[in-house]
Amino acid sequence: MPSSRYALVTYVRNPVGEFVEELRRELHPTKAHLAAHLTILPPRELTGTEAAALEFLEEACSRVVPFDVELGEVETFLPTTPTVFIQVKRAAYRIRELHDQLSGKELCCEENWPYIPHLTILKTELDEQARAACVVARERWAQFSGKRQVHVDELMFVRENGGCWQDVAPLPLGRGQLSSKL
């Protein structure tokens, strides 16, 4: 039986997230069930137990101060993969730092590609589908009038089970930080 894979994401539950989910429903209906998210740790098998990984993540996330990122333009990862995404433009370094800090212990693995902070719109089977979807996504994103910002204050540890991703545990950021209101 193959091992479960795990990932770490932050859900985008604001108008940007709604935009991405609506666009995905239109362009790739078979994946319409996926929630809009920024991937912090791409899918991987654990080197230890789920409980140990969760303990590490809880402690590490408690020391991270919540932050905002600003989104940039719509791009693709072609020719590497037929994925259409929105770039993280401002504060991408914060996402990369978080990725690097949390890639240790039970979550350590060799990733297939260099880590690039992004908000996935869709991943297709064929390059041509991704190119066509990218054209539509760029047009729609240019018309989006809301704030292109994501507040990162909670991560979600997720597990792949039978091809579906399930939430394992929420990980609030900054629990170990002193309040700035003291």
Residue ranges, per PLM feature:
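Histidine-dependent nucleotide/RNA phosphoesterase domain, centered on the 2H-phosphoesterase fold
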Residues: M1-L182
